[in-house]
Regions:
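Conserved polymerase palm-domain catalytic core
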Residues: 56, 130-223
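Long, hydrophobic, well-ordered secondary-structure blocks that form the structural core
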Residues: 112-124
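Conserved pre-motif C helix in the palm subdomain of viral-like polymerases
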Residues: 77-108, 168, 202-223
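Non-catalytic, well-ordered alpha-helical scaffold segments
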Residues: 20-23, 47, 51, 87-92, ...
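Active-site-flanking structural segment that lines cofactor/substrate pockets
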Residues: 47-77
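Short, compositionally biased low-complexity segments
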Residues: 1, 16-32, 64-69, 95-103, ...
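Non-catalytic, polymerase-adjacent accessory regions of viral genome-replication enzymes
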Residues: 1-52
Length: 223
């Protein structure tokens, strides 16, 4: 199965760094932030910047820029590691062409994390559907036990609400890289993904603030 997948997916990195794919990725990255001088300046020379980026990727001379680090305090305190626009352009193209479809293909339908078309409303609708199904099943079981239909019924049950404490900060780089390599069969994509992970420094901790980081963490949870 892996040989078949490798045969079909071996060209994905090449597709991700096509000029059109990179240009489209840049336009997506600029949405909602064109008011920033740095974004406006980069987009003003979009064609030239995209061409230069593609040439560096083709010839293996591409290097990640330094990160912008800052702290947000709402809804809770988080340290953000922001990727420069040039790097986000490449990473968005890589996510769209390879990482997103490869990593999310194994997720269950109810998983709405970083899923296209699956926002908060989707998650609430699915939770409502599951609660309604649970209520019907419990009521039917109670009616079967007593031999007649019930009017009003209160179904007892539990909902598990949890969070992984310091998940991004505590993830070992080796674990994240292995989780992605298990799902992505394109060697160039795996190599660049590993470089992005290692760029955060140390052996633990994935920077919070990019789509690549989010997809890596979802792959870890799905291991």
């Amino acid at each position: 199965m892996r040989d078949s997948a490798a045969k079909n997916m071996g060209k994905q990195f090449d597709e991700a760094i096509q000029f059109g794919a990179l240009y489209k990725a840049l336009k997506k990255c600029c949405r909602g932030v064109r008011w920033k001088p740095s974004t406006a300046g980069y987009e003003h020379y979009a064609l030239a910047n995209t061409y230069r980026l593609r040439q560096e990727l083709l010839h293996g001379s591409y290097k990640l820029s330094s990160y912008q680090r800052f702290t947000i305090r709402e809804p809770k305190v988080r340290d953000i590691v922001a990727t420069r626009l040039r790097d986000r352009q490449f990473q968005r193209a890589l996510c769209d062409a390879v990482l997103y479809p490869s990593i999310t293909s194994s997720f269950i339908y109810d998983n709405g994390a970083c899923q296209r078309g699956k926002g908060v409303d989707f998650a609430l609708d699915r939770m409502t559907a599951h609660l309604q199904q649970y209520y019907r099943e419990q009521k039917q079981a109670a009616e079967a036990a007593i031999g007649h239909r019930l009017g009003r019924f209160c179904a007892g049950g539990w909902v598990l609400a949890c969070d992984v404490r310091h998940f991004f900060d505590s993830t070992p780089h080796a674990v994240a890289k292995a989780a992605v390599a298990k799902r992505v069969y394109d060697s160039e994509t795996v190599r660049h993904n590993a470089r992005i992970i290692d760029s955060f420094g140390g052996e633990r901790g994935i920077g919070l603030g990019s789509q690549v980081s989010q997809l890596n963490q979802l792959a870890v949870l799905d291991t």
